[in-house]
């Protein structure tokens, strides 16, 4: 793709990996080729020139005169960078963690397990800060960059969201601002595929985030697109996704996950997502995407970072100081918090919502992006800088308590609001009626009764792991075999934690956490 750069002249070495949605705008502004535009941006703005870029990217600049390396990622880190530097000044970096760990191994540098990082994965399902599972190997945090001169490395931030609130706006004005920013983000993504002649992939589920994207794309005239979903068959997710696709007229493709096969590719998933989160997180996404012809498809539009229905990832204490014991955002249910389950970035966020928006939304939720990038270019319009700024400038109370984002859908996309939301069984339009709230309460009570009676119903969940394993005992046999073959790779407290997670009566997802960490040892530490 012509968005990428790998070139040099007498002054600079330029490396840019990614999809730049405003490339043509920048070429016009700086009156030159893409390479010339990037050089002018750097010469005018210095080490924070990447502030002008929009899209999915990471990159590096070497300034030959200043003998300075600059490394950077985009504001939400869709294309991560990993790096190592020791007290001797030895440095390595790469867009995949194995590039760094393989370089360490080739140079005789010992690769030691980071107990803090791996403990966080075993509890939360993901890393909680810039750490990895390897000591001295870090991941560049979203919106950060590195400046390296000789043996000196300095980490700085060029972009971070803040909870600055717009005041004095009416509900309708907030909605207009959200909609304008969102439509512009989707428009840029569609136009990028049009630039290269690719079809756009639109993920559709039973939720409302993906639905917002699909209806916006249709309103913008996007025709060269397909819609996809993957889930347990017979459930609400597939029925609602199909209804959305049929209503919009997009070709619709569905992959059933009934056989639970997404639990088997432990090593492949951990390798491709850099071991950054639980390996089952993508469920059937990889199996689906690898069926597609990569010559035909460009951007995959996902609803990650959305939370249109709830209005926030944090539905209580959103404006309080950040804390870690937010039970909603931990995959594990067996292990307790301990002295290793902490976060070194807790203090950089002003409130609880922002902390979890970055950790759960970007570090965990978007951990599947590097895996997807083997097949397509995943993007989320909810991660567009201008949209995020409007979103975060809208008061938390208004977004959550008054469900402003649901009202946005009802006002701007009324047809989408008349289709039920899989999680509640009611439509977003009914959310503001007594009848709708009553229906939601009845559904909640029914599900709670089933839970208390230990009745597993495949229709309630998009990815019913416990149901799959009950129906197919060979899945648990596989997980146990993988554990037995690899358990000696771990040691100390990590090994003890793995033993607890692999007991017969532990949930499947806890076992998946154990396998994730063992695969991490196998591929990045041994």
Predicted feature residues:
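Cysteine-centered catalytic environments shared across enzyme families
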Residues: 1-204, 208-260
């Amino acid at each position: 793709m012509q968005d990428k750069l790998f070139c040099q002249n007498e002054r600079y070495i330029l490396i840019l990996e990614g999809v730049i949605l405003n490339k043509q705008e920048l070429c016009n502004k700086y009156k030159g080729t893409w390479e010339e535009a990037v050089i002018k941006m750097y010469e005018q703005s210095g080490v924070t020139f990447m502030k002008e870029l929009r899209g999915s990217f990471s990159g590096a600049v070497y300034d030959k005169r200043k003998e300075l390396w600059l490394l950077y990622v985009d504001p939400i880190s869709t294309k991560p960078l990993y790096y190592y530097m020791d007290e001797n000044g030895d440095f390595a970096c790469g867009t995949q963690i194995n590039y760094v760990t393989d370089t360490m191994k080739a140079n005789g540098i010992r690769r030691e397990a980071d107990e803090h990082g791996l403990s966080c994965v075993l509890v939360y399902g993901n890393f909680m800060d810039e750490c990895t599972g390897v000591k001295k190997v870090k991941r560049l945090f979203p919106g950060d960059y590195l400046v390296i001169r000789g043996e000196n490395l300095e980490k700085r931030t060029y972009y971070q969201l803040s909870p600055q609130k717009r005041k004095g706006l009416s509900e309708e004005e907030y909605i207009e601002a959200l909609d304008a920013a969102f439509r512009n983000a989707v428009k840029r993504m569609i136009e990028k595929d049009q630039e290269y002649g690719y079809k756009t992939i639109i993920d559709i589920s039973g939720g409302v985030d993906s639905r917002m994207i699909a209806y916006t794309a249709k309103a913008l005239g996007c025709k060269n697109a397909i819609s996809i979903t993957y889930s347990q068959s017979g459930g609400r997710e597939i029925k609602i996704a199909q209804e959305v696709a049929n209503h919009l007229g997009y070709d619709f493709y569905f992959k059933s996950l009934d056989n639970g096969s997404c639990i088997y590719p432990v090593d492949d998933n951990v390798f491709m997502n850099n071991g950054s989160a639980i390996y089952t997180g993508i469920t059937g996404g990889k199996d689906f995407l690898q069926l597609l012809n990569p010559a035909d498809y460009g951007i995959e539009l996902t609803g990650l970072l959305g939370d249109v229905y709830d209005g926030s990832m944090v539905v209580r204490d959103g404006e309080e100081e950040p804390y870690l014991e937010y039970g909603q955002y931990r995959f594990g249910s067996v292990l307790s918090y301990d002295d290793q389950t902490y976060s070194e970035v807790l203090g950089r966020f002003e409130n609880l919502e922002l902390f979890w928006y970055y950790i759960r939304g970007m570090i965990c939720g978007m951990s599947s992006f590097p895996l997807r990038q083997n097949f397509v270019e995943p993007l989320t319009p909810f991660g567009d800088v201008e949209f995020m700024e409007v979103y975060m400038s809208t008061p938390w109370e208004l977004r959550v308590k008054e469900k402003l984002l649901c009202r946005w859908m009802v006002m701007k996309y009324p047809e989408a609001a008349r289709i039920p939301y899989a999680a509640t069984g009611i439509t977003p339009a009914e959310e503001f009626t007594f009848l709708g709230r009553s229906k939601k309460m009845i559904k909640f009570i029914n599900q709670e009764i089933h839970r208390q009676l230990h009745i597993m119903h495949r229709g309630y969940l998009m990815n019913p792991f416990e149901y799959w394993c009950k129906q197919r005992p060979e899945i648990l046999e596989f997980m146990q075999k993988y554990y037995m073959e690899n358990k000696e790779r771990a040691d100390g407290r990590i090994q003890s934690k793995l033993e607890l997670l692999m007991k017969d009566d532990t949930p499947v997802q806890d076992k998946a956490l154990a396998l994730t960490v063992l695969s991490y040892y196998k591929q990045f530490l041994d």
